Amino acid sequence: MLNKVCLIVFLFFSIPSFAGDQATMGKTKLTFTIVAPKSLSQEGKQLFLSHAEWMKSTHHHTGPQALLSYDVSEMNELTNPTDLKSKPTGNVIFILSEIYESDAGVEDHFARTPDWKDWPKFDKWLNKCKVTKVSAAKIFNSLTWAGK
């Protein structure tokens, strides 16, 4: 019995040390996946550059509304997403990822959205694309080694 208890205690304390930094566990993640026609990709990129500047100047850096991470990535949509050598479809995929301390950060973000000068253009652009929006997902698993 004591051996089992020791094993459980050892696993409880040692496994996280091999799993990378888990600083985002339990935080709130907003993710938009946008599939845009190639003809709209440059417009999208410009809008995301404006969005990043607005985010930097308006969002909290500490407290329950803190924006902890922000990134936008893009790639050509592929006919076979797991084969990087497959033919492109002619669309571009953008992935917007924002991590907040809590749901309060997402609520604050959406309350501020109308103040972004390019919001009407962004909304119009989104309506021309195929969009999947995940507004406030809880992070339950996280491995982060970036910069280490």
Give, region by region, the residue ranges found by the protein language model.
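Sec-dependent N-terminal signal peptides
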Residues: 5-14
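Boundary at the C-terminal end of the N-terminal hydrophobic targeting segment
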Residues: 19-21
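Active-site-flanking beta-strand signature of metal-NTP-handling nucleotidyl enzymes
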Residues: 27-35, 95-97
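Structural beta->alpha junctions
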Residues: 35-40, 100-101
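Short amphipathic alpha-helices within nucleic acid-binding modules
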Residues: 42, 102-112
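A common structural junction motif
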Residues: 52-56, 114-120
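Short, glycine- and small/hydrophobic-rich beta-strand elements in well-ordered beta-sheets
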Residues: 56-95
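Alpha-helical transmembrane segments and their immediate juxtamembrane flanks
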Residues: 132-148
